[in-house]
Amino acid sequence: MTIEQSPTHSDDVRNVYDGFGRVYGSVWGPNIHYGYWENDADDSSVEVATDRLTDLMISGLDAQAGQRVLDIGCGIGHPARRLVRTSDVDVVGITISHIQAAEATEHTAEAGLSDRATFQYADAMDMPFPDGSFDAAWAFESMWHMPDRGQVLSEAARVLRPGGRLAVADVIQREPITPEGRVVLDHVCENYGVSSLGTVDEYRTALAANGFVDVEIRDITDNVIRTLGLMADAFETVRDKLADVVGKEQADSLIDFVRRFGSIPESGYVYLTAVRA
């Protein structure tokens, strides 16, 4: 059974990232996503590990020089800029946070990449692009915020050209729900702009239903789950600053539930690639 909540409104997700996004960035860095560690002995820094996960996405996307890539849920654009530099592509990023779009645009100008990467406010379930506008697309930890993943995949298929590649990194439900897990997952869904946690089987079904083929799904939970404990530790160092932004009760709850989310067996993570038929 999948953990489901009432459909997340755009305002819920926007408020999460607008509310403490800058505090998050001050302790975690510019990558608003998990890190990837090769094994238990890997002592890479958060910066190295988060860039490594970006590089995994870049490799799977396999975008070619000069192609146009859509970043679905772009955050402040750090992975997009890395993609531009690595693959010599043009990127269009979309987000439902005006603040994130502005920050991404500012940071991209500072990096001298404004002619290669642009960012705008848009709804991933109703994209403002013509059919066949992009050669490739990725969704980097944005899908669990979507009220209807199938609709996002339908839109991705629509704006991708035939043969276009899709890469997704997403938090999923890995195991059947236990009573303890339900408490944690319900709290995460209700308080942090998360609509639901899907499963691998649900992804396979939704991808096939929307015309994607050559689907490859890799469970990388063991490589990324360390993120949550480290993130809780990082938030702990700025607890007072976080409390100033979201309130003491919410700050305490955030730190507690991030740590607990990383310790329950239901908490999983997948990296997948597919091709638009």
Question: What are these model-predicted stretches?
Answer:
Residues R68-I72, I76-D126:
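Class I SAM-dependent methyltransferase SAM/SAH-binding core
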